[in-house]
Swiss-Prot record:
SUPFAM superfamilies: Thiol:disulfide interchange protein DsbD, N-terminal domain (DsbD-alpha), Thioredoxin-like. Its EC number is 1.8.1.8. It comes from the Bacteria. It is a multi-pass membrane protein. Belongs to the thioredoxin family. DsbD subfamily. The gene is dsbD. This is Thiol:disulfide interchange protein DsbD. GO terms for cellular component: plasma membrane. GO terms for molecular function: electron transfer activity; protein-disulfide reductase [NAD(P)H] activity. It catalyses: [protein]-dithiol + NAD(+) = [protein]-disulfide + NADH + H(+); [protein]-dithiol + NADP(+) = [protein]-disulfide + NADPH + H(+). It is found in: Cell inner membrane. It comes from Photorhabdus laumondii subsp. laumondii (strain DSM 15139 / CIP 105565 / TT01) (Photorhabdus luminescens subsp. laumondii). GO terms for biological process: cell redox homeostasis; cytochrome complex assembly. Residues 1-24 form the signal peptide.
Length: 575
């Protein structure tokens, strides 16, 4: 009778014994409610001949980041990879991003592979409730693929960006190609360029001046287009070269080297030294230009094309800076378009002078040198943009602040002798802007930056690996320990800093607690080991240990908690 009753009881309870139900039934309150990364993003792949399909099945309430998807071939060559369109996702800290829900399928054409070939796939995602996983890496073995004669193989190097994502990254570069036309117009008013325009216009027209404005316009436009074609070809060549070395150009040492070059180019704009082609090369180019027939469309076009290669001291630095910028972007379309618009901007004043005479030109004076120096500050913005990727956002803000203060101070000094009323108003505006721009520098000097306030308001002690944690635990004899896992890519971690750790009640509750923080942004082997040792699946995760170094049961925090909930959680911890 007892045996039958027991069997009936087990039969009735069997629906509860599925894995999910069993976990829910026996799960402790402090356990992680979020799925393991392999269950949240179920990854699979299949290769049929030269076509490889990568498939992610994404659980409801979870999403993958478009920008965090990277594909690296190893001993293989891949064709063009096209990512599907994602869904726009607004984030308080990272702004507008593109994510994938439910499913992501990526088709990877394999143009060449052997039996030892692989591709390394890296991806990262989050839970919508406020929980992010570290970057995941999967090794996908490839079957041998013999390259076809008609196959257009584009890369045997690591592919970190798809063509679409590379073009999207153009939005994050310091300026769009349309800004190049304004830069070109500005360069036209520097002391090395503007005084030459009347002479160039007379050379374009030749000894027999055309009678109609239409003829004059087409001659001037031919000269400008010749110059623009030369610059466009330079842009395409440099961008194509940059695309081949795109991964190397993202290396911190390369970014630092490019930044130094930009700074040297900018210093030449301030008159410290002059940059130009060797005189022998310039002489040869000038002789070739003089051999062209002026007054004819083809001859004028050829003169413009050669003039594009003859760089004056005022144009060498900006042109070199733009070329380096294009090489770093690796975007061939934007590269050619940027240089074309730059040349067109330089040519617009020349067209006006050729049509209507040099009376349209403003008088020469010191202001032309000021224009040249202003472009020096513009070039200095490029190394700041590049160095941000190496030194981080906090130092990046300080560099932008320093550059802004320098530029505004330069403008104030230039106008300080003027007695004009409007100039006085401009000086007042410049002073106000300088005070605003100095704020990040003031915060840094006094040690009160926003980042420091948010990250160190609780006086966290930073740890980097498992050995450091063990050593601290051994030395700790009487305090409760809180270990916070943080990463720059973790949105909810930043929410903890901004909304929870800054709360006075939370700070009071943790007053007698030893506060540790592990920054796992880089996902290094040591950081991975620390995560694995403590069974941390994702971030944010906060652990509490007693004075003996043992984790307090049911105390682990997974995901974001506001100040009220976190304060209640702290109150339930054993004292």
């Amino acid at each position: 009778m007892i045996k039958r009753t027991l069997m009936l009881f087990l039969l009735l309870c069997s629906p509860l014994l599925t894995p999910a139900a069993a976990n829910a039934l026996f799960e402790q309150p402090g356990q992680n409610p979020y799925l393991p990364v392999d269950q949240a993003f179920m990854f699979d792949f299949q290769q049929k001949g030269d076509k490889l399909t990568l498939d992610w099945q994404i659980k409801p309430g979870y999403y993958l980041y478009h920008k965090q998807l990277h594909i690296e071939p190893q001993q293989a060559t891949l064709g063009k990879i096209t990512l599907p369109q994602g869904t726009a996702h607004r984030d308080e800290f990272f702004g507008e991003t593109e994510v994938y829900f439910q499913q992501l399928i990526v088709n990877v054409p394999v143009t060449k592979a052997n039996n030892n070939s692989n591709i390394v796939v890296t991806y990262q995602g989050c839970a919508a409730a406020g929980y992010c996983y570290p970057p995941e890496t999967r090794l996908v073995p490839l079957s041998a693929v013999i390259p076809s004669k008609t196959t257009d193989a584009i890369s045997a190097e690591p592919v970190h960006k798809t063509p679409e994502s590379a073009s999207n990254d153009q939005q994050h570069l310091p300026f769009s190609p349309l800004w190049a036309i304004l830069i070109g117009i500005g360069i036209a008013f520097t002391p090395c360029v503007l005084p030459m325009y009347p002479l160039i216009s007379s050379i374009i027209l030749g000894s027999q001046r055309p009678k109609s404005l239409k003829q004059i316009f087409w001659l001037a436009l031919s000269y400008v287009q010749g110059m623009a074609v030369t610059y466009t070809l330079l842009g395409l060549i440099v961008a194509a070269a940059g695309l081949q070395f795109q991964a190397a150009l993202q290396h911190p040492y390369v970014l630092i080297g490019l930044s130094v070059l930009f700074i040297l180019l900018a210093l030449s704009m301030f008159g410290l030294y002059s940059l130009q082609l060797p005189s022998a090369v310039q002489t040869r180019l000038v002789n070739w230009s003089n051999q062209q027939k002026n007054g004819s469309l083809f001859g004028v076009f050829a003169m413009g094309a050669l003039a594009g290669l003859i760089c004056s001291p005022c144009t060498t630095a900006p042109l070199s800076a733009i070329l380096l910028y294009i090489a770093q972007s690796g975007n061939t379309v934007a590269g050619g378009l940027t240089l074309y618009l730059y040349a067109l901007g330089m040519g617009l004043p020349l067209i006006a002078v050729t049509l209507f005479g040099h009376k349209l030109l403003p008088r020469s004076g010191p202001w032309m040198q000021y224009v040249k120096e202003a472009f020096g500050f513009i070039i200095l913005a490029l190394p700041v943009f590049l160095l941000e990727r190496v030194i981080g956002d906090a130092w990046g803000i300080r560099l932008w602040s320093l550059l802004a203060v320098s530029f505004l101070g330069w403008g104030f000094v230039l106008t300080i002798r003027s007695q004009n009323g409007w100039v006085r108003v401009i000086q007042l505006i410049l002073l106000i802007l300088m005070l605003i721009a100095t704020r990040p520098l003031q915060d840094w000097f006094w040690g009160t930056t926003v980042t420091q306030q948010s990250q160190h308001s609780l006086n966290f002690r930073q740890i980097n690996n498992w050995q450091e944690l063990e050593q601290i635990m051994t030395q700790n004899s009487h305090k409760t320990v809180m270990l916070d896992f943080y990463a720059d890519w973790c949105t909810a971690c930043k929410e903890f800093e901004k909304y929870t750790f800054s709360d006075p009640q939370v700070q009071s509750q943790l007053g007698d607690t030893l506060l540790l923080q592990a920054n796992v942004t880089n996902n290094s082997p040591q950081q991975k080991q620390l995560l694995e040792k403590l069974s941390v699946r994702g971030l944010p995760t906060i652990l509490f240990f007693d004075s003996q170094g043992k984790e307090i049961p049911d105390s682990r925090v997974n995901g974001f908690m506001d100040a009220t909930r976190f304060n209640e959680h702290l109150q339930h911890l054993p004292k």
